[in-house]
């Protein structure tokens, strides 16, 4: 029972990947200062380099400081599961938090962790009308080669995991673009990398992501109508240019259409690209979807545009009798197969992933 005028404090140490259970064989929640010290000693003996040891020490330090200042404070350590994105992990974290809230009824919580992935529970705590302080404990290392290697290893493990899907997706699309379009594929890849580096250099990407996270309004209007107008203008210019460039001596309608397609295809491709870029910018600004999902969708659209270009060129060359019918049919089959395979790979989601996302959303919403 909370005394009148007395505020309850809880120091909550989070080990979301359950190093305490897997390495030290301990069950959570671990309650009280003495039990937490015993736990960190046992975990430290099992793995002296584990960052959760320092997280628990950081929690004990905060506990002692609050106790010394006369606060009514408790300390507890909770853990999740080695598969941090699993339903089991989310349920374990939620159950332990609910138990601690019932047991201690805290007004203030100090959330202590060794990495940002442990802070997935922050929104859940804030939804309970509890003021939360975040404290991230980072291990200090000496400037030796082994320490540098250790820091790099931990950085990759703790930080880069969220970027690996994005990096692998980009590499995969780069290889596909090169395989289909040869030299022009590398130009596209280099252009995308250049745009990304430029956005990083001038701070556009950081500003954009901050505004998206804060759901702030942008000072600019929608880009898609402007890009649509430019695309229509390019199509009209391309149409006029293509008609004026066709050889007047074309003897048959098929030859006329073939030449028209070969002259018009670049204007059509450019207009579609501008249209796609405008839609992409609007989606990034206004959509609440995951960034990786948006990038996959528009990378796929980019490949479809260039595959359509190759098909139109093949059709024009066939009409002009530059390639055989068999070669044209093979091109159509190959490119359509690529589109089907890519769509299956990119947009087929597992039921496990869907369940986890629903569970995670329910936790963050309280």
UniProtKB/Swiss-Prot annotation:
The organism's place on the tree of life at top rank: Archaea
Transmembrane residue ranges: 164-184, 188-208, 223-243, 256-276, 299-319, 325-345
Entries under InterPro entries matching the protein: DUF373 (IPR007254)
Localization, UniProt: Cell membrane
Keywords: Cell membrane, Membrane, Transmembrane, Transmembrane helix
GO cellular component, one term: plasma membrane
Pfam family membership, one: DUF373
Family, similarity comment: To A.fulgidus AF2058.
Protein name as it appears in the record: Uncharacterized protein MJ1032
Organism: Methanocaldococcus jannaschii (strain ATCC 43067 / DSM 2661 / JAL-1 / JCM 10045 / NBRC 100440)
């Amino acid at each position: 029972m909370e005394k009148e005028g007395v505020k309850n404090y809880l120091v909550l140490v989070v080990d979301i990947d359950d190093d305490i259970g897997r390495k030290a064989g301990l069950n959570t929640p671990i309650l009280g200062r003495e039990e937490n010290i015993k736990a960190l000693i046992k975990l430290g003996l099992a793995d002296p380099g584990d960052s959760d040891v320092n997280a628990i020490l950081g929690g004990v330090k905060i506990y002692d400081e609050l106790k010394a200042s006369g606060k009514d404070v408790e300390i507890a350590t909770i853990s999740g599961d080695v598969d941090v994105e699993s339903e089991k992990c989310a349920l374990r974290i939620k159950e332990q938090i609910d138990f601690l809230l019932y047991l201690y009824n805290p007004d203030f919580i100090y959330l202590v962790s060794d990495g940002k992935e442990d802070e997935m529970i922050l929104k859940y705590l804030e939804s309970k009308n509890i003021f939360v302080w975040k404290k991230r404990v980072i291990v200090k290392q000496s400037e030796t080669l082994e320490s540098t290697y250790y820091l790099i290893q931990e950085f990759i493990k703790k930080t880069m995991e969220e970027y690996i899907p994005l990096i692998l997706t980009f590499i995969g699309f780069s290889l596909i673009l090169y395989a289909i379009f040869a030299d022009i594929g590398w130009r596209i890849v280099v252009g995308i990398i250049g745009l990304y580096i430029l956005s990083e250099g001038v701070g556009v990407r950081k500003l954009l992501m901050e505004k998206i996270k804060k759901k702030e309004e942008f000072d600019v209007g929608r880009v898609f109508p402007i890009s649509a107008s430019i695309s229509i203008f390019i199509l009209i210019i391309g149409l006029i240019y293509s008609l004026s460039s066709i050889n007047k001596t074309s003897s048959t309608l098929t030859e006329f259409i073939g030449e028209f397609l070969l002259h018009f295809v670049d204007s059509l491709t450019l207009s579609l690209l501008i249209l796609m870029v405008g839609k992409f910018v609007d989606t990034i600004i206004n959509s609440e979807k995951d960034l990786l999902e948006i990038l996959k969708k528009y990378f796929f659209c980019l490949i479809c545009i260039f595959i359509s270009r190759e098909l139109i060129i093949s059709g024009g060359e066939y009409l002009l009798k530059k390639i055989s019918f068999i070669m044209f049919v093979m091109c159509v089959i190959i490119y359509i197969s690529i589109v089907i395979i890519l769509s299956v790979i990119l947009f087929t989601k597992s039921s496990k992933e869907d369940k986890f996302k629903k569970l995670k959303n329910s936790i963050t919403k309280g």
